[in-house]
């Protein structure tokens, strides 16, 4: 199954909350409420994905809790602790041409404007001011680098992103 078909993980279930089957939610979406824009959810239990509906959710202090269909007791909720929450790729919003999901950038080759292959995007780090590509250098990197951190700032450093070719063109010195 390609990464395009794999479910998109948006969070995970935390510990149970109360005695009626509510669960704390850890969300990876930009806003805490963003995870509830998607329905149904997919839960990964024992390596298998299954569909589940959110019946209710609310803020509980600084935490967010939810009640899921078919989860009515504390024991049922505890059995789901640490399950990943995902959605199908088709449920994801279509982004404007100049915006990208991180999952689509991971694995892209990074080439600078002089044609030097700097490696592949291994991870993306959120720094507050801008995202940063963590690029794992090729084994035979001519500059002796194991990895590079390249700010994802379009026009200044990121010249072009071609998701079809899985390539990112950057204006970046390979010695950095």
Curated annotation (Swiss-Prot):
GO terms for molecular function: ribosome binding. Coiled coil: none annotated. Keywords: Chaperone, Cytoplasm, Ribosome biogenesis, rRNA processing. The keyword rRNA processing applies. One of its GO terms (cellular component) is ribosome. Pfam families: PRC_RimM, RimM. GO terms for biological process: ribosomal small subunit biogenesis; rRNA processing. An accessory protein needed during the final step in the assembly of 30S ribosomal subunit, possibly for assembly of the head region. Essential for efficient processing of 16S rRNA. May be needed both before and after RbfA during the maturation of 16S rRNA. It has affinity for free ribosomal 30S subunits but not for 70S ribosomes. The PRC barrel domain binds ribosomal protein uS19. This is Ribosome maturation factor RimM. It comes from Shewanella piezotolerans (strain WP3 / JCM 13877).
């Amino acid at each position: 199954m390609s990464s395009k078909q794999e479910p998109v993980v948006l969070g995970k279930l935390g510990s149970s909350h109360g005695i009626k089957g509510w669960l704390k939610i850890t969300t990876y979406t930009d806003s805490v409420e963003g995870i509830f824009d998607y329905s149904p959810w997919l839960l990964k239990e024992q390596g298998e994905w299954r569909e589940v509906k959110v019946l209710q959710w609310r803020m509980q202090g600084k935490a967010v809790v939810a009640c899921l269909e078919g989860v009515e007791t504390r024991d049922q909720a505890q059995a789901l602790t640490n399950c990943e929450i995902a959605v199908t790729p088709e449920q994801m919003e279509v982004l404007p041409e100049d915006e990208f999901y991180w999952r689509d950038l991971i694995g892209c080759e990074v080439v600078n404007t002089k044609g030097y292959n700097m490696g592949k995007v291994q991870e993306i780090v959120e720094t507050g001011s801008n995202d940063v590509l963590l690029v794992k250098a090729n084994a035979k990197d001519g500059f002796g680098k194991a990895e590079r951190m390249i700010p994802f700032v379009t026009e200044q450093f990121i010249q072009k992103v071609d998701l079809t070719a899985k390539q990112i063109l950057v204006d970046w010195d390979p010695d950095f």
